[in-house]
């Protein structure tokens, strides 16, 4: 019907106030309680980093590095799109920012080389979803803040599914995608030069994750430090003549943040209302009636549920609304909360390219100038990459949680062994 999700959620809350014993005062309190989180303050900083990078010469340097590494392969520009998305995912944490950057920079060149615009939109949208998995992921921040799960652990756990999606898209582009123009393989000196030019912006993920893992700062402080690094180091080097654009970048990042912030507030009130009406008990009883108390079966049931939910609702409000249900089923199935978190996020990421919602695909198709329906058709073969990744994340938790266990063992429930000689982790 075209009604924004935030307004629809608030309408549901108002109906509950009208026809139940819930007071308006309680609901207003929940609206503000939902956004009263220090962790959520990290989101605008990461959005600002992405916007500052997108409007500078830094992006071109990262694209040149991707071209020297994979531009000679079959489907060269398609490979470049995917590899650049991996790079940029480690900076912005926003798939929308990734779509905007790729649509402005690489999409016109793909058009000149004869790539079908529908394929270009489908690939850009699919590749941009890695920004929601590879740290710093905004979805991980929201999930961690709402579900009381380690954000640093979610960052690390998202690396495996993010890289798997990237590799899957590159394999598809190589085997079945348009061939593109044949280009000469870059020499070692060209690769070294491109790496040197892109080294400073690629330090941002190192600063973010290094600081969080070492305990030097929280995710929110990591976002602030990344902003300072971009403003005081990268911009003077890469964009000295366009400082007058900074207010616009700040304003745009604020606008980008206001949309999910409003959704978070509305979803928090709606989720509290659902919990008050015993929604989690009803849904969890229904799911356990089908899947039993088996952890894998509960997880598969939730995957099916969130594939459907992701088709109609944005990921951020979906996470907040369903968090009470997720927590209850995680406890019933004796599932590691970190594993459950990365499964839910990976599944919701799939919804960014599936109709009728498909936000990333919708934005990419508008930027590229192709109908949404045509872009959906060209996306269908790429769905296999996402479904295989989801299956892998569900079936192989030890692989997905390897990095958190190695670098942040407390995030997966490990505790120090007597004598402090190591960690003991749950099976």
Please annotate each region the language model reported.
Residues 1-427:
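Alpha-helical transmembrane segments of multi-pass membrane transport proteins
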């Amino acid at each position: 019907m075209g009604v924004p999700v935030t307004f629809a959620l608030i309408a549901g809350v108002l109906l509950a106030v009208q026809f139940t014993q819930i007071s308006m005062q309680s609901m207003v309190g929940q609206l503000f309680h939902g956004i009263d989180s220090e962790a959520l303050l990290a989101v605008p900083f990461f959005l600002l980093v992405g916007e500052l990078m997108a409007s500078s010469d830094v992006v071109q340097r990262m694209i040149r590095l991707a071209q020297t590494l994979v531009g000679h392969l079959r489907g060269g520009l398609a490979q470049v799109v995917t590899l650049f998305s991996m790079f940029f995912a480690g900076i912005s944490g926003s798939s929308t920012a990734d779509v905007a950057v790729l649509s402005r920079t690489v999409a016109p060149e793909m058009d000149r080389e004869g790539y079908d615009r529908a394929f270009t939109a489908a690939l850009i949208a699919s590749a941009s979803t890695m920004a929601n998995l590879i740290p710093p992921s905004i979805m991980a921040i929201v999930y961690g803040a709402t579900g009381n799960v380690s954000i640093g652990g979610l960052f690390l756990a998202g690396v495996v599914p993010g890289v798997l999606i990237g590799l899957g898209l590159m394999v598809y582009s190589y085997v079945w995608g348009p061939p593109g123009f044949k280009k000469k393989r870059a020499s070692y000196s060209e690769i070294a030069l491109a790496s040197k030019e892109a080294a400073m912006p690629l330090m941002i993920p190192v600063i973010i994750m290094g600081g969080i893992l070492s305990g030097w700062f929280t995710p929110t402080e990591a976002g602030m430090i990344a902003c300072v690094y971009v403003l005081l180091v990268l911009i003077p080097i890469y964009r000295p003549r366009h400082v007058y654009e900074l207010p616009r970048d700040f304003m745009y990042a604020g606008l980008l943040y206001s949309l999910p912030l409003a959704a978070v507030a509305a979803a928090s009130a709606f989720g509290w209302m659902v919990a008050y009406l015993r929604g989690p008990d009803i849904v969890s009883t229904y799911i356990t009636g089908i899947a039993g108390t088996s952890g894998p079966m509960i997880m598969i049931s939730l995957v099916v549920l969130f594939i459907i939910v992701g088709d109609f609702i944005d990921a951020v409000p979906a996470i907040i609304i369903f968090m009470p249900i997720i927590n209850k089923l995680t406890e019933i199935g004796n599932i590691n909360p970190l594993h459950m978190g990365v499964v839910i996020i990976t599944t919701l990421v799939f919804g960014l390219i599936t109709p009728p919602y498909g936000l990333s695909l919708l934005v990419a198709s508008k930027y590229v100038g192709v109908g949404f329906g045509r872009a959906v058709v060209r996306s269908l073969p790429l769905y296999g990459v996402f479904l295989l990744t989801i299956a892998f994340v569900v079936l192989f938790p030890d692989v997905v949680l390897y990095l958190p266990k190695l670098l942040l063992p407390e995030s997966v429930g490990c505790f120090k062994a007597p004598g402090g000689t190591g960690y003991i982790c749950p099976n």
